[in-house]
Amino acid sequence: MRVVIQRVSHASVTIEGVCKSAIKEGFMILVGIEEADTQEDADWLCKKIIGLRVFDDENGVMNKSILEVGGNILVISQFTLHASTKKGNRPSYIRAAKHDVAIPLYNYFCQELSIGLGKEVGTGEFGADMKVELLNNGPVTICMDTKNKE
């Protein structure tokens, strides 16, 4: 699993002209799922995301987690995170999981984030054409990949 985490002042996702989810301060997370990804990968990411200390403390130092600031999370499925650009100019998405693998794992990931956060996370709609708006705060953008746990 691969995620791009952006610290935001606010974010929203619109599908067919209707706002599906909107959040205030927190994380907007793009998540890409591969065929070989598992619930253990999702669990590892959730633990890291919930504990990630990238919000300012009273001294302006990034030292607080999303739990400590009462932040929110918006999760957007993003198969293009697994694009391969080695050959030619048209990306290949062969590494991205098919719907029958990706949807249950995406739902599990969102559910586990909700449990860790103690409140519902906002989501997009898997496979939909979405319009995502966000105000990146910092900017702070962090990438994580369960195949490269650094």
From Swiss-Prot:
- GO-annotated cellular components: cytoplasm
Q: Tell me which domain of life the UniProt entry assigns to the organism this sequence originates from.
A: Bacteria
What EC number(s) are associated with this protein in UniProt?
3.1.1.96
The main enzyme category here is hydrolase
Give residue numbers for sequence motif Gly-cisPro motif, important for rejection of L-amino acids: 138-139
Biological process according to GO: D-amino acid catabolic process
* Protein location: Cytoplasm
The record ties this protein, via Gene3D superfamilies, to:
D-tyrosyl-tRNA(Tyr) deacylase (3.50.80.10)
This entry's Gene Ontology molecular function terms read:
D-tyrosyl-tRNA(Tyr) deacylase activity; Gly-tRNA(Ala) deacylase activity; Ser(Gly)-tRNA(Ala) hydrolase activity; tRNA binding
Q: Tell me, what's a Pfam family for it?
A: Tyr_Deacylase
Q: Which reaction does it catalyse?
A: glycyl-tRNA(Ala) + H2O = tRNA(Ala) + glycine + H(+); a D-aminoacyl-tRNA + H2O = a tRNA + a D-alpha-amino acid + H(+)
| Entry keyword set | Cytoplasm, Hydrolase, RNA-binding, tRNA-binding
Q: Give the family, as the similarity comment puts it.
A: Belongs to the DTD family.
Q: How does it assemble?
A: Homodimer.
- Please give the HAMAP family that the UniProt record associates with this protein: Deacylase_Dtd (MF_00518)
Query: What exactly does this protein do?
Result: An aminoacyl-tRNA editing enzyme that deacylates mischarged D-aminoacyl-tRNAs. Also deacylates mischarged glycyl-tRNA(Ala), protecting cells against glycine mischarging by AlaRS. Acts via tRNA-based rather than protein-based catalysis; rejects L-amino acids rather than detecting D-amino acids in the active site. By recycling D-aminoacyl-tRNA to D-amino acids and free tRNA molecules, this enzyme counteracts the toxicity associated with the formation of D-aminoacyl-tRNA entities in vivo and helps enforce protein L-homochirality.
User: PANTHER family from the xrefs?
Assistant: D-AMINOACYL-TRNA DEACYLASE 1 (PTHR10472:SF5), D-TYROSYL-TRNA TYR DEACYLASE (PTHR10472)
The record comments on the domains as follows: A Gly-cisPro motif from one monomer fits into the active site of the other monomer to allow specific chiral rejection of L-amino acids.
From the Swiss-Prot or TrEMBL record, give the protein name.
D-aminoacyl-tRNA deacylase
- Report the source organism: Phocaeicola vulgatus (strain ATCC 8482 / DSM 1447 / JCM 5826 / CCUG 4940 / NBRC 14291 / NCTC 11154)
Phylogenetic placement of the source organism: Bacteria, Pseudomonadati, Bacteroidota, Bacteroidia, Bacteroidales
Give the encoding gene's name.
dtd
